Amino acid sequence: MAKKIAGQLKLQVPAGSATPSPPIGPALGQRGINIMEFCKAFNAQSQDLEKGSPIPVVITYYQDKSFTFTMKTPPVSYFLKKAANLKSGSKEPGKQSAGQISRAKVREIAETKMKDLNANDVEAAMRMVEGSARSMGLEVVG
């Protein structure tokens, strides 16, 4: 018989550095999920990723207090800030430019994020990434 799902939880956890401290500990503890078991499993799976990059994780927990989780790729904004060497986007996107990013970098980001985006081809994924860049105040050149 299949396990009965009790719910889902979405978190953004830095790669390789999941700890029982807030915000992870309280979010998992409230739902009766073994915090240390999650931290060890997450850190083991994310050890080959860039340390500290924010990894969206979807945790499915069951009524018997067990859980499974899936990791996604870091957010588009993380890749854009990294590619443009920015700390944050523009305070007034559309009026004030935060920097520039090449179409080649946009394509690279789109190919990396392709499995998580709701796009059928790379061109559609590129348009989504360009939209994110514009909303951050980045100018797409080339």
Curated annotation (Swiss-Prot):
Which GO CC annotations does the UniProt entry carry? cytosolic large ribosomal subunit
Q: Where is this region: Disordered?
A: 86-105
Q: Can you summarize the PTM annotation of this record?
A: One or more lysine residues are methylated.
Q: Which GO terms describe its molecular function?
A: large ribosomal subunit rRNA binding; structural constituent of ribosome
Which InterPro entries does the UniProt record give?
Ribosomal_uL11 (IPR000911), Ribosomal_uL11_bac-typ (IPR006519), Ribosomal_uL11_C (IPR020783), Ribosomal_uL11_C_sf (IPR036769), Ribosomal_uL11_CS (IPR020785), Ribosomal_uL11_N (IPR020784), Ribosomal_uL11_N_sf (IPR036796)
- Any one Pfam family here would be Ribosomal_L11_N
What the entry lists under PANTHER family is as follows: 60S RIBOSOMAL PROTEIN L12, LARGE RIBOSOMAL SUBUNIT PROTEIN UL11M
Q: Which family does it belong to?
A: Belongs to the universal ribosomal protein uL11 family.
Q: What protein does this entry describe? A: Large ribosomal subunit protein uL11
Q: Which organism is it from?
A: Chelativorans sp. (strain BNC1)
